[in-house]
């Protein structure tokens, strides 16, 4: 999928792709986090949390996008790519995003419980990592947060 030439990729448009994935996660009983990886206007991969369905603790939306995007590009370095994710990345995902050499990460809602891009820790700012990845927070924040609140309010994780 690519966006039409006449339609510049905006953070809001791209985050809507990630939100669509987050809704799929909720329908599957997964924590509703979605992500979309773009190279320019080209969508490389969009996915959502699949930990429950895959029985894989690393099957976060961000990790799945990195894996599939790197495979499509034929290499693990994701220079020039931007990942949009509905929730602030956790320690595992923030580390993987930095190590992938991603150009930019854009996230919607902060995660006061596990967010590692400023909420509980700021991994990207750690000088030991020498990260060039740029980070943008708060795109469609209320929509992203509302989806998560609704999911947890209705006890959608009863099978955990």
Model segments located where?
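Glycine/small-residue-rich phosphate/adenosyl-binding loop
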Residues: 45, 62, 66-71
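Short beta-strand scaffold segments in enzyme catalytic cores
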Residues: 33-41
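Zinc-dependent deaminase
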Residues: 1-25, 89-160
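A short, polar/charged loop-to-alpha-helix boundary motif
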Residues: 53-63
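Short beta->alpha transition motifs characteristic of CBS
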Residues: 44-51, 134
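A cytosolic small-molecule/anion-sensing beta-strand core signal
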Residues: 39-40, 67, 79
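Immediate flanking context of iron-sulfur cluster ligation sites
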Residues: 75-88
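Small-residue (primarily alanine) positions within well-ordered alpha-helices
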Residues: 18, 22-25, 35, 61, ...
